[in-house]
Amino acid sequence: MRKIFNILFACTISLAFVACSDDEPKQPSIFANDLSADSTAFDKWLRTNYSDPYNIRIIYRYQDYETDQTYNVIPAKMENVKALAKMMKHIWIDAYGEVVGQDFIKSYSPRIFQYIGSAEYRSDGAMVLGTAEGGLKITLFRVNAMDIDNIYIDSISPFPNSAAVPIDMNYWFFHTMHHEFLHILQQTKSYPTEFNTVSAGKYHANDWINVKDEEAPLEGFVTGYASGEAREDMAEIYSTYVTHTPEAWEKILKAGEKGGDTSGRDAIEKKLSIIKSYLKESWGFELDDLRKVVLRRSHEVLQMDLKTLD
């Protein structure tokens, strides 16, 4: 499922081989056919932290057959790839492992994560934030926009400025990962059909892109994207809740009130209650426990050395 937001870059790569120097490249190649693939210190770190324990593969070298040829994209920078891989393990994988157990991630995590340096832009100007393919692969874009010297993870602003710099890691990466992971859980174990009825008749199937995030709560949605359909609504509530503080969540609920009308707030709270029950009864964990761990780990990562593999 594509996660798309409103907010061309064209790149043509040609390779020429010229026998004019015996110098070895100073950095690992960004292309997949490099002979050093799977033999660098970082590749060994990935095997130790992702492949061996969880059967998860990180694709960071550019592979054109792994990307949508409709779009022109560029490879991710190595220093940003390493930083994102370390953060993803600490905030995402280890958070679920701490709350639900490592076997949960081993069983249900997507098997492939692909890092792309730039964004994908549709013909209508919309930016593709991330994609998921059948619960097996998640692609994350804009990796090169990360400032690894100034990591920013905003858990207190429910309606962030998407154009702000440094980029918000929650908005651009971790929200998307939790969103897509919830889709895997939905597909594995059916969620209560009652959820679909709460906002029935209010979804914007064809024009959700025109629904502003800050206005969506009045209609009972936590983001504009959530107003597209019930499945996305559920994934947006889940990913928004787990990446924001209770105070930020309350701001969303307050935005669902106008005068004496609390129907927007009521709808969001009703749907959240259904999600919490679903996760506890079908998956054996409390959403509030997961949020506490995610928020704690998001703070911890700000103190981590993201430039080394230690």
Task: Please state what every model-predicted region is.
Residues 140, 154-192, 235:
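Active-site recognition of the HExxH zinc-binding catalytic motif
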Residues 15-19:
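C-terminal motif of bacterial Sec signal peptides marking the signal peptidase cleavage site
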Residues 24-25, 82-146:
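Auxiliary, metal-adjacent structural segments of Zn-dependent hydrolase domains
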Residues 203-310:
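Metalloprotease/metallohydrolase-associated module, dominated by Zn2+-dependent proteases
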Residues 174-216:
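Acidic, glycine-rich loop-and-strand cores that form catalytic or ligand-binding grooves
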Residues 5, 21-102, 106, 261-263, ...:
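Acidic/polar, low-complexity intrinsically disordered N-terminal segments immediately downstream
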Residues 2-10:
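Sec-dependent signal peptide recognition
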Residues 70-78, 148, 160-168, 172, ...:
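Second-shell loop/turn segments in exported
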